[in-house]
Regions:
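Helical element adjacent to the flavin cofactor pocket in flavoenzyme catalytic cores
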Residues: 2-24, 29
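Helical substrate-recognition/capping region of FAD-dependent monooxygenase/halogenase enzymes
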Residues: 9, 13-18, 221-327
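Conserved mid-domain beta->alpha element of the FAD-binding
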Residues: 11, 61, 166-253, 320, ...
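Conserved FAD-binding catalytic core of PHBH/FMO-like flavoproteins
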Residues: 13, 38, 58-176
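A conserved short coil-to-beta-strand element within the FAD-binding core of flavoproteins
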Residues: 25-40
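Short beta-strand motif preference
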Residues: 41, 124-125, 189-190
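A generic structural motif
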Residues: 42-46, 92
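Core beta-strand elements of the Rossmann-like FAD/NAD(P) dinucleotide-binding domain
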Residues: 48-58
């Protein structure tokens, strides 16, 4: 796990080091005309409310769950209909307490809870919202600490209830959505603009990073006249299947954790208790890996085998004493 705000700050600090990157803050995209070979974009300067017009050969839309680009291009999304309301809390433990870094997903039908130590003393808590909760008061510090109380010992039994700092708390509706296509002409959707998933596998940002890894080396090859432009069509083909698999896995995990029906939760608990003695029973509940690319550049007909398209770790190689990544 990593701290997402720190990671995003690092990305921005690295981006400003490159002269070929123009970072425009305080602008809003208000129109996009995505033609077959050129894109015309209108940007609104928030400060002086003046428009700026730019053209580009390619657009990579990383504009989040409410993506303007996705809506403007009329790209529809498939809804997995798995919405759940949760309160997400960032909690900073006092430095004098050493915390247990194990992650917990607590199957308590009265209040399903997730505890994830991220980096340092930073801990992410997630509490499922009950039907009779008042959202206006649920996020109050008093109520947050009340929900933390039964599980705080898991971090360290010595941590007092009112110690530490609540950095933020916010109610979210967890969605499962997948754009029906990640590409329109020379525009591409990446990250939450292309897909949204419940957080139970910690894969939201990770899948966005995988989007960029899949697309950018291909785009670089096309722009440098190394690859035929047709290679860009493989981006959506390769990524959609894997993201669909991850979303379904996260939904399954969420159903296990988040059940608030007494009978269902009781049967689940009995099953898990029995499975603790018969580990094979846990296999259907585990996140199935490896992820496999079944479409796109992989020719499963020409090279039919079990490992074709399987994603492997990204090693580094010593090439003339220069440590470089495999690609």
């Amino acid at each position: 796990f990593f701290n997402q705000p720190i990671f995003e700050k690092f990305l921005r600090s690295e981006a400003i080091k490159h002269n070929n990157i123009d970072i425009k803050l305080g602008y809003k995209l208000t129109n996009i005309d995505a033609q077959e070979s050129i894109n015309n974009l209108t940007l609104l300067n928030i400060n002086n409310e003046e428009n700026e017009y730019i053209t580009s050969n390619y657009v990579l839309a990383c504009d989040g769950a409410n993506s303007f680009v996705r809506k403007a291009l009329n790209i529809e999304s498939f809804d997995y209909k798995c919405d759940q309301d949760w309160v997400v809390v960032d909690y900073q433990v006092d430095d004098k307490y050493k915390i247990n870094t194990d992650r917990y997903q607590i199957c308590d039908y009265k209040r399903p809870t997730t505890i994830v130590p991220i980096t340092g003393q930073h801990v992410r808590w997630e509490f499922k919202v009950n039907p009779d909760d008042n959202l206006e008061t649920l996020e109050d510090e008093k109520n947050i600490r009340k929900m933390m109380k039964p599980h705080l010992w898991r971090l360290n039994p010595e941590i007092p209830l009112h110690s530490g700092k609540l950095l933020r708390s916010s109610a979210y509706t967890f969605h499962g959505l997948l754009a029906k296509n990640f590409k329109f002409n020379n525009c591409f959707l990446l990250g939450d603009a292309a897909h949204q998933m419940p957080p139970f596998l910690g894969q939201g940002l990770c899948q966005g990073i995988k989007d960029s890894y899949n697309l950018c080396w291909k785009l670089s090859g096309v722009m440098n006249n190394i690859f035929n432009k047709e290679i860009l069509n493989t981006y959506s083909l390769e990524r959609k299947g894997i993201v669909d698999f991850v979303i379904k896995g996260a939904m399954k995990q969420g159903d296990i954790i988040g059940s608030q029906d007494w009978l269902t939760a009781t049967l689940r608990d009995i099953y898990l208790n029995v499975a603790s003695y018969i580990p094979k029973l846990l296999k259907p509940l585990k996140f199935q890996k490896p992820w496999k690319i079944k479409n796109g550049m992989i020719d499963n007909d020409l090279f039919p085998n079990d490992v074709n398209g399987v994603i492997i770790p990204h090693p580094s190689l010593d090439i003339k004493v220069d440590n470089k990544l495999f690609d």
